[in-house]
Amino acid sequence: MIQQETRLKVADNSGAREVLTIKVLGGSGRKTANIGDVIVCTVKNATPGGVVKKGEVVKAVVVRTKSGVRRKDGSYIKFDENACVVIRDDKSPRGTRIFGPVARELRDNNYMKIISLAPEVL
């Protein structure tokens, strides 16, 4: 579960390394985000020469959470870290590579470009 002020690792090569959640999008008063949800973030740590700069406000989609998610068959999937991918307004990623595995739940929300770039879909 990702909420306001949560810091996440960025799992792409957009230039951001770490982001801080400002807001969870999707309905008024929504408190938490899970895998596949869009959040508004600010970049706290960035690589020099990247597309995204430190202090920039960006949108991102959550691809891994420590709390995990329950699937329809009753199984759970959890990851070792909270991670996101920086996206544009049309749901396409700003980076050209994705690092680490992503959850299959992204397919339900039509993030096909992220799934195709990911090295592993769990």
Curated annotation (Swiss-Prot):
<dbReference type="GO" id="GO:0022625">
    <property type="term" value="C:cytosolic large ribosomal subunit"/>
</dbReference>
<comment type="similarity">
    <text>Belongs to the universal ribosomal protein uL14 family.</text>
</comment>
<dbReference type="InterPro" id="IPR019972">
    <property type="entry name" value="Ribosomal_uL14_CS"/>
</dbReference>
<dbReference type="Pfam" id="PF00238">
    <property type="entry name" value="Ribosomal_L14"/>
</dbReference>
<dbReference type="GO" id="GO:0003735">
    <property type="term" value="F:structural constituent of ribosome"/>
</dbReference>
<keyword id="KW-0699">rRNA-binding</keyword>
<comment type="subunit">
    <text>Part of the 50S ribosomal subunit. Forms a cluster with proteins L3 and L19. In the 70S ribosome, L14 and L19 interact and together make contacts with the 16S rRNA in bridges B5 and B8.</text>
</comment>
<dbReference type="GO" id="GO:0006412">
    <property type="term" value="P:translation"/>
</dbReference>
<dbReference type="GO" id="GO:0070180">
    <property type="term" value="F:large ribosomal subunit rRNA binding"/>
</dbReference>
<dbReference type="InterPro" id="IPR036853">
    <property type="entry name" value="Ribosomal_uL14_sf"/>
</dbReference>
<protein>
    <recommendedName>
        <fullName>Large ribosomal subunit protein uL14</fullName>
    </recommendedName>
</protein>
<dbReference type="InterPro" id="IPR000218">
    <property type="entry name" value="Ribosomal_uL14"/>
</dbReference>
<keyword id="KW-0689">Ribosomal protein</keyword>
<keyword id="KW-0694">RNA-binding</keyword>
<dbReference type="InterPro" id="IPR005745">
    <property type="entry name" value="Ribosomal_uL14_bac-type"/>
</dbReference>
<keyword id="KW-0687">Ribonucleoprotein</keyword>
<comment type="function">
    <text>Binds to 23S rRNA. Forms part of two intersubunit bridges in the 70S ribosome.</text>
</comment>
